[in-house]
C-alpha cells in the first residue's frame, strides 16, 4: 500500500451474538484463551511458519496497486489462511497424529528391542575381535608392510644432467 511501514497483526473477533447457540453447546470465551498465554509451540519448532502477508506478497515502491485492493487482498489472504488451516486440521490433524503416534511407537520399539541389543552385543564382542585383529595385523600385515618399506627405502634416485 505504501502508507504502512510496520507489520500489522490481523485478528478476527466475533461478538457472542453472532454465534448460534441453538445446538446447546457452550462456546469458550475467546478472550480467556488470548489471556491464558497457552503456547502450543514452546520450543519454537515451527517458528518458520509465522508468515505475514508482507512476508509473502510485496509491491515495490515504483509499482503500487490501489490502497483498497491492497487492503482487500491482505484481508482475504489472512482469512483464507486462517480458514484453510482450520479446515485442513479438522480433517487431517487426528489421522496424522494417529499415524505419527504409530510411527514413533514403531521406531521406539525397534530402537529398544532390536537396535540397542544389537549395538550392545557388538560392543561385547568387540574386545575379542580387537584382540584377533591385532594378532592378524602383528603376524601378517605388519611384517609385509615393513619388508615393502625396507625394499623401497634402499632405492636411490640420481638425476644426471645430459
Swiss-Prot record:
Q: Which family does it belong to?
A: Belongs to the caveolin family.
The identity of this protein, by name, is Caveolin-2
> What processes does the entry annotate via GO biological process terms?
caveola assembly; endoplasmic reticulum organization; insulin receptor signaling pathway; mitochondrion organization; negative regulation of endothelial cell proliferation; positive regulation of dopamine receptor signaling pathway; regulation of cytosolic calcium ion concentration; skeletal muscle fiber development
**Is Disulfide bond among the key words of this record?**
no
- Sites where Phosphoserine occurs are at 20, 23, 36
InterPro entries per the UniProt record, alphabetical? Caveolin (IPR001612), Caveolin_CS (IPR018361)
Organism name: Ateles geoffroyi (Black-handed spider monkey)
For membrane topology, the record states: Peripheral membrane protein
Q: What is the lineage of its organism?
A: Eukaryota, Metazoa, Chordata, Craniata, Vertebrata
